[in-house]
Amino acid sequence: MAKEARQLNILLVDELPERSLAMEKLLTNLGHKIVARASAGDDLSEIVSRNLPDIIIIDMDSPDRDTLEHMQTISSDRPRPIVMFTNDDDSETIRKAVRAGVTAYVVDGLQPQRVVPILETAIARFNEFQNIRQELESTRNTLEERKLVERAKGILMKQSDYDEETAYKAMQKIAMNRNMKLVDLARSIIAAAELLK
C-alpha cells in the first residue's frame, strides 16, 4: 500500500507559459500547491524569500548562467530541494547544476508518472545532504574548539611551567568555577596572551 505524500508548497520556474500551466495542473492534481510562479529571468532568491516554498521545480530547455547563479544563492541562503527538468544532457551543464544546488537533474522532460518518485527522491537526497552538511559543520566546530583549547593549554604550560595534564585540569577548574565553556575560557586565555605580547 503506497503512503500518501504530503502537500508540498512549490515554486514553479518555467520559460514557457503553456508548459508552466500544464506542469501546474499536474502538480495540483497530485495535491500540491503552487505558491509562486517565475520565469528564469526573475529574481528567484527574492521569490524564495517571500514565498518560502518547500521545493523548487524548474522546467527549462537548458539552464542558463543566471538561473544557476540564483540556484547557488538559494542553496547558500535558504537551502531547499531543487528539481530541474531539462532537455540539456551536456555533462558540464549537469555538473554546474549540481554544484549550484540542484538536487535532481532530469533529462528528457516531464513524464507525469515519474513526478512523485522524482520529488520524493529529491527531497530524501536533499535531507540526507543537509544532515551530512550539519555533521560536517559540527565536526569542524569541534575541531576548531579543540585547537583553541590546545593552544590555550600550551600558553598555560609555557607561562606557568605546567605539564599538559596540570594545565588542562587548571583550565577545567577555572571554567567550572566561572560557569564557562572550556572553549570560551581558551579564547580568553589566547586573547590575554595576545595582549601581553
Residue ranges of predicted features:
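Receiver (REC) domain switch/output surface
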Residues: 26, 115-127
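C-terminal output helix
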Residues: 92, 110-119
